[in-house]
């Protein structure tokens, strides 16, 4: 549509980043003349059409929230999405009230992979980053959480190859359900868990 051929493969490199970093990426790779605003409009139109009837929750979402509450842990969301989009998803799924904090991309200066969003999440949750786990589905998110001093756990989704960040992972699970089952059976020295896209 824009004359640049297929662009979908770029999602792997921009997953988890905010709008500013996403635009920077496309201009660096396709030149300063790249019509990012038109691209974004088309992307959003396609996305909203896709999710018009709601977005299915990730496997184990409700189970993990229940386990975290039973263990008395604080729960936060740290997503590069807009506040409007994130809150809408959480309320539609009926889980908004589980969360002690919701930090979105428009609330911080530097998006993932910079640590700002997770630093702010821990500040709002009133926990030391070393006592918090970040559940992530993106390489940029893992780097962000690690940079903030948190314990990053990868739950692969679109990006299955995690070799670039395996050395900084606290753990890796196939799904939220697997993490919930593990958490039920162990005692960890943590006070909070923050996650990125709970319903995407």
List PLM regions with ranges.
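Helix-loop "lid/cap" segments that line or gate small-molecule binding pockets
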Residues: 18-33, 89, 121-122
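Substrate-recognition element of Asp-dependent hydrolases with the DxDx(T/V) motif
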Residues: 64-90, 145
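Acidic, Mg2+-coordinating phosphoryl-transfer loop and its flanking beta/alpha structural elements
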Residues: 133-171
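Metal-dependent phosphoesterase signature
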Residues: 5-10, 25-63, 71
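Structural recognition of alpha->loop->beta junctions
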Residues: 94-104, 164-184
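Conserved Lys-Pro-Asp/Glu-containing loop-to-beta segment of HAD-superfamily phosphomonoesterases
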Residues: 111-139
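Conserved H-loop
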Residues: 5, 33, 96-100, 128
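Conserved small/polar residues in nucleotide/adenosyl-binding loops
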Residues: 196-200
